[in-house]
Amino acid sequence: MQKVILVGKPNVGKSSLFNRLARRRIAITSDVSGTTRDTNKAKIEVEGKECILIDSGGLDDSSELFKNVKAKTLAEAKNSDVILYMVDGKMMPDDEDRAIFYELSKLNLPIALVINKIDSKKDEQREWEFVNFGSKNSFGISVSHNTGVDELSIWLAKHLEEKVQIKADTSDDFDDFLENYNDEGELSDEIDYESKNIRVGIIGRVNVGKSSLLNALVKESRAVVSDVAGTTIDPVNEIYEHDGRVFEFVDTAGIRKRGKIEGIERYALNRTEKILEETDVALLVLDSSEPLTELDERIAGIASKFELGVIIVLNKWDKSSEEFDELCKEIKDRFKFLSYAPIISVSALGGKRVHKIYPLIVEIYKNYTQKIQTSKLNEVIGEATKAHPLPRDKGRVVKIYYAVQFKTAPIMIALIMNRPKCLHFSYKRYLTNKLRESFSLTGVPIVLIPKKRGESDEDKEQ
């Protein structure tokens, strides 16, 4: 699929145009210069033709970080098919903008000069100030007023290939669940998890090495890596194929202490949570060179909150196996709610042991999406209740009639009971442990939901 890249200095409106063309808010927009530090990607349709739209980091030489962004942006432009170079129509053209535009023009790719913030008839006169760029294709637009964007879209469509009709999957396995169960009482096989992309969110506090880990996983310098805390603001998307499986990685914004979350980063935190709602497996990155913090524990709680498959990644590891065992014990003690999560040590910058993450992701995804046979499930539950009967409720017998899995990703199991409100959390934990002993459930949560006979899923009781 062809790639279209948006290039320009910070705060000229690239992210706003990106959101306008994508018809949804993907990139974070702000009046703060340089909000987009990493490249964002989205598949869009322009006049019936599909392409990948790339929102690059702002070009600015005012700091070392933005020099890195500039180098990455220019490299990304060379691998694109169409370039949209964006400038601020309310500012005077400068030599640097012209120099970069000339440099990009040498690539012999279709390139348009997009003059943003032409918000009125008076502003239209400013377009003439950019004549010395020598652009054959100039468009005065106002993203905020949505003027001129249609003309730009028509030009863009002329330089895109015809939309390719992708053959539909031969099965109908991508429909929604059919009433959750089939006639035999088993969970319906309506979703083909084997062919779906595995969505992986990389989470952790600022500067623990999330971007370095993403770069190591996809074997290229993708996210901007810097010692400046909080470099990644936009969640960074990367689609990568490994051993026949497609992985969608998202490097989420680093999370700071609550008191330090301000403005744009608060929005980034909200975006992070929204992304985790759509994630299958979370890579919780910890900095092994520093002591565990309360914030680490809070972030781990986010993964638990969204009931994701989880791998705990100890980054910057250069210690002995004995020290690894000690730290694992500390993590298990601090993160009791993630006791099911495997722990792996890596050095993202050096690429050490990073390759071991892929098979772990695949294993956990398989566990996360598995369907447990109802007969086997009830066999385990029956043996567990026989070995350790449920406590009575004020002398009254508490029974589990049967259990059935009604959802995958995460695994949700309904316990059909006579007194669902009387199931103590400690007995839930006991049943969960028994299920883990009997089935492959490494790295994934198990949600047990006690329900009264005839109770609907909407009335489920946590």
UniProtKB/Swiss-Prot annotation:
GO terms for molecular function: GTP binding; ribosome binding. The keyword Lipid metabolism does not apply. Residues 370-454 form the KH-like domain. It holds the Pfam family MMR_HSR1. GTP 2 binds at residues 204-211, 251-255, 315-318. The keyword Nucleotide-binding applies. Residues 2-164, 198-369 form the EngA-type G domain. InterPro entries: G_ENGA (IPR031166), GTP-bd (IPR006073), GTPase_Der (IPR016484), KH_dom-like (IPR032859), KH_dom-like_a/b (IPR015946), P-loop_NTPase (IPR027417), Small_GTP-bd (IPR005225). Keywords: GTP-binding, Nucleotide-binding, Repeat, Ribosome biogenesis. GTP 1 binds at residues 8-15, 55-59, 116-119. It comes from the Bacteria. GO terms for biological process: ribosome biogenesis. SUPFAM superfamilies: P-loop containing nucleoside triphosphate hydrolases. Gene3D superfamilies: 3.30.300.20, P-loop containing nucleotide triphosphate hydrolases. Belongs to the TRAFAC class TrmE-Era-EngA-EngB-Septin-like GTPase superfamily. EngA (Der) GTPase family. GTPase that plays an essential role in the late steps of ribosome biogenesis. Associates with the 50S ribosomal subunit. This is GTPase Der. The lineage of its organism: Bacteria, Pseudomonadati, Campylobacterota, Epsilonproteobacteria, Campylobacterales.
